[in-house]
Amino acid sequence: MSLESYKEKRNFEKTPEPETGKDGKSTGNDDLVKAKSLDSDSRETKKGKLEFVIHKHFASHLHFDLRLELDGVLKSWAIPKGPTINPKDKRLAVMVEDHPLDYKEFEGKIPEGNYGAGQVYIWDRGTYHAFGTEDKEKSSDMLRDEIEKGHLTFIMEGNLMKGEFALVRLKKASPKDWLFIKKNDEFASDIDISEIKAPAEDKKKMI
């Protein structure tokens, strides 16, 4: 997938979502409902590592969006029932269009009449790497190959999501249908972690 699909679905004169231009800067309309960029000092991410973000999206149907940085974009999966840290509870994850890297900072309200209309919160964020290496370049090479093969295993280092996870493409379904799986490790639990609210969710309005 490429960012062309992302751009074709959106009117950036009417949505605050980021449109990454050729210069790498967001070209969204700043006069509309604002997207909230988290202050760089509050980030848990580290330089030299791949980043991830999980959005909680109150669209026509509540769902979560897992976004993994790879090759200059955010590889994205919609998880209808939300993420899990229970190895017995595999969750459907539908692969959607790639999103621009700017989207990892996005938090705001997409106005009615636009694709994906509804409130978007950053639910969790952090860094991740391929299973077996923390090196960014080696991780990228491994993850790229694993996505192509339909089975990737990675380590998440977020505020909520920690430890080993896998994404596995379903062979007898749509090529967009994957399973999001928590591996059995010290961070596994039978609690429903998706019930935890996003940090900004209790605020009456986005800044």
Which residues does each predicted region cover?
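A charge-rich, low-complexity, intrinsically flexible signal that marks solvent-exposed coils, linkers
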Residues: 1-207
